Amino acid sequence: MSSGAEKIVSSIMSEAQAKADAIIREAEDEAAGIVDEGEKRARMASERILESARKQADMRYQQIISEAKMNARRAELEAREEVIQEAFKKAEEELKNLASTSQEEYVSALRGMIKEAAVEIGGGDLVVSMREDDRSLDLGLDKIAAEVEAETGKKTTLKVGDSIRTIGGAVVRTEDGLIEVNNTIEARMSRFRKALRSEVARVLFE
């Protein structure tokens, strides 16, 4: 091969090599870019997954804390309710004992309950029902009737009716049975339970 031909071949090969090198560099750069982009996307995806996991963990933590507080509050309320119910039970037992052992004090209280019920009805001809043990007590019904009449301005009579099952107190009704006031100890406890509950809770827990 002549020197001229060799130069031409050498020039062509040099140019081809340069183009090949350029293509290889471009391919390497593109590949590096793809790898970088892939790593970037992988990091972003990983961060999103981690953030989502953190949020879910925090939500679950808050839920557990909330449930624990709610359960603790429920347990506290149940314990308070148990103590209050026990206090009411004890009070009822003490009232029952009062009705059976402290004659003078109970008779005075019973007179007051009969008068209160009679005044609430508005006086008139009234029937007083009590437990069997109380029907024979000297309650002074005529005197109570006079006091009711003085307060209501209506002529009043009180007579003993049938016996009832109660721990104490009385049920007072008109003779025709149209109006009745239950002033037994149980009924009074039931009526005043809401107000008493607040007072009992204040005394027990404050």
From Swiss-Prot:
<dbReference type="GO" id="GO:0046933">
    <property type="term" value="F:proton-transporting ATP synthase activity, rotational mechanism"/>
</dbReference>
<dbReference type="GO" id="GO:0005886">
    <property type="term" value="C:plasma membrane"/>
</dbReference>
<comment type="similarity">
    <text>Belongs to the V-ATPase E subunit family.</text>
</comment>
<dbReference type="GO" id="GO:0005524">
    <property type="term" value="F:ATP binding"/>
</dbReference>
<protein>
    <recommendedName>
        <fullName>A-type ATP synthase subunit E</fullName>
    </recommendedName>
</protein>
<keyword id="KW-0813">Transport</keyword>
<dbReference type="GO" id="GO:0046961">
    <property type="term" value="F:proton-transporting ATPase activity, rotational mechanism"/>
</dbReference>
<dbReference type="InterPro" id="IPR038495">
    <property type="entry name" value="ATPase_E_C"/>
</dbReference>
<dbReference type="GO" id="GO:0033178">
    <property type="term" value="C:proton-transporting two-sector ATPase complex, catalytic domain"/>
</dbReference>
<keyword id="KW-0472">Membrane</keyword>
<keyword id="KW-0375">Hydrogen ion transport</keyword>
<comment type="subunit">
    <text>Has multiple subunits with at least A(3), B(3), C, D, E, F, H, I and proteolipid K(x).</text>
</comment>
<keyword id="KW-0066">ATP synthesis</keyword>
<dbReference type="InterPro" id="IPR028987">
    <property type="entry name" value="ATP_synth_B-like_membr_sf"/>
</dbReference>
<comment type="function">
    <text>Component of the A-type ATP synthase that produces ATP from ADP in the presence of a proton gradient across the membrane.</text>
</comment>
<dbReference type="Pfam" id="PF01991">
    <property type="entry name" value="vATP-synt_E"/>
</dbReference>
<keyword id="KW-1003">Cell membrane</keyword>
<dbReference type="GO" id="GO:0042777">
    <property type="term" value="P:proton motive force-driven plasma membrane ATP synthesis"/>
</dbReference>
<keyword id="KW-0406">Ion transport</keyword>
<dbReference type="InterPro" id="IPR002842">
    <property type="entry name" value="ATPase_V1_Esu"/>
</dbReference>
